[in-house]
C-alpha cells in the first residue's frame, strides 16, 4: 500500500494524503461550539423561521380564505424567500470563516499547531455546513410541523425536495463565501465583498444576462448554459421542475 492510499495510523485515526480525519473531527466540533455563541446565526435562523411561518399563513390554501397553506402551496411560496435569505446566510458565514480569525490572530495560532491548511479548510467547511443545515432545519421544521398540523400533508414530498435543494444552495454559496474569505485580510472587507456577491447573484445577474442576450444576440442554448453558472438560477430551475 503506497503512502498516498488510505491507511490506518497507530493512534486509530484514518489518514489520506496527509489529512487526519481525527484532526478534522476536532475542528468540526470547534466550529459547532463557536456556532452556538454566534448571535448572527441565531438571528438568521429565527428570521427565516418567522418569515416561513408568515408566508405559510398568508398563502391561500384554496379553502376560500386565509390560513396555513398545505405543503405544496407553501413550498412554492418559499422559493423566493429562500433565494433571498439562504444565499446571504451562506455567503456571510463563509466570508467570516477565515478572514475573521485571520484578523484576530487566532488563525495563525491554529496553523501553528500540528494541523495542515487542508485539515483546517475541510474542518471549517464541514462545521459551518452542519451549522447552516441546522439553521435551515429549524426554520423549515418549525414551519413544516405547524403547516402539517393545520394544513395538508399530502404533498409533503414537495416540501422535502425544497429543503434538500435549499441545503445544496446554502452549501454552494458557503463555498463562494470561503473563496472570498481566503482572499480577504480583514473581516469587514470579506463581508463587504460577500454582500456585493449576494446582490450580484440575487439581482444583477438576471439583468446582466438579459442585457447581454439582447446586445450580443446570444442563442438560447448559450444563454441557458451561462445561467447555470449562478447557483441561484440552478436552484430556481430545479425547484420549479420539482
Where are these regions (language model features)?
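Cytosolic juxtamembrane amphipathic/interface segments immediately preceding
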Residues: 25-35, 67-71, 116-119
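A structural motif at transmembrane helix-loop-helix junctions in multipass membrane proteins
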Residues: 167-216
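Long, hydrophobic alpha-helical segments
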Residues: 77-100
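Terminal transmembrane helical anchor/hairpin motif
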Residues: 3, 62, 203-242
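Helix-loop-helix units of permease transmembrane domains in multi-pass membrane transporters
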Residues: 97-129
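Hydrophobic/aromatic residues in alpha-helical transmembrane segments
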Residues: 87-94, 142, 175-176, 205, ...
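Secretory targeting signals
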Residues: 54-57, 64, 68, 74-75, ...
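Aromatic- and glycine-rich beta-strand/loop motifs that create alpha-glucan
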Residues: 2-45
Amino acid at each position: 500500500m503506497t503512502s498516498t492510499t488510505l491507511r490506518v495510523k497507530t493512534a486509530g485515526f484514518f489518514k489520506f494524503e496527509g489529512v487526519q480525519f481525527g484532526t478534522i473531527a476536532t475542528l468540526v466540533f470547534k466550529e459547532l461550539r463557536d456556532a452556538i455563541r454566534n448571535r448572527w446565526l441565531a438571528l438568521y435562523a429565527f428570521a427565516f423561521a418567522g418569515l416561513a411561518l408568515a408566508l405559510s399563513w398568508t398563502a391561500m390554501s384554496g379553502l376560500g380564505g386565509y390560513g396555513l397553506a398545505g405543503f405544496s402551496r407553501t413550498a412554492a411560496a418559499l422559493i423566493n424567500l429562500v433565494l433571498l435569505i439562504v444565499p446571504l446566510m451562506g455567503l456571510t458565514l463563509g466570508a467570516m470563516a477565515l478572514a475573521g480569525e485571520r484578523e484576530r490572530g487566532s488563525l495563525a495560532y491554529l496553523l501553528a499547531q500540528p494541523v495542515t491548511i487542508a485539515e483546517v479548510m475541510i474542518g471549517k467547511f464541514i462545521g459551518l455546513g452542519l451549522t447552516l443545515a441546522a439553521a435551515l432545519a429549524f426554520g423549515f421544521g418549525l414551519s413544516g410541523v405547524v403547516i402539517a398540523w393545520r394544513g395538508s400533508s399530502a404533498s409533503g414530498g414537495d416540501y422535502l425536495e425544497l429543503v434538500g435543494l435549499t441545503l445544496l444552495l446554502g452549501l454552494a454559496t458557503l463555498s463562494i463565501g470561503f473563496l472570498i474569505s481566503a482572499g480577504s485580510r480583514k473581516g469587514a472587507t470579506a463581508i463587504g465583498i460577500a454582500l456585493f456577491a449576494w446582490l450580484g447573484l440575487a439581482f444583477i445577474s438576471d439583468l446582466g444576462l438579459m442585457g447581454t442576450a439582447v446586445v450580443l444576440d446570444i442563442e438560447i442554448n448559450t444563454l441557458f448554459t451561462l445561467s447555470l453558472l449562478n447557483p441561484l438560477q440552478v436552484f430556481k430551475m430545479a425547484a420549479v421542475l420539482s
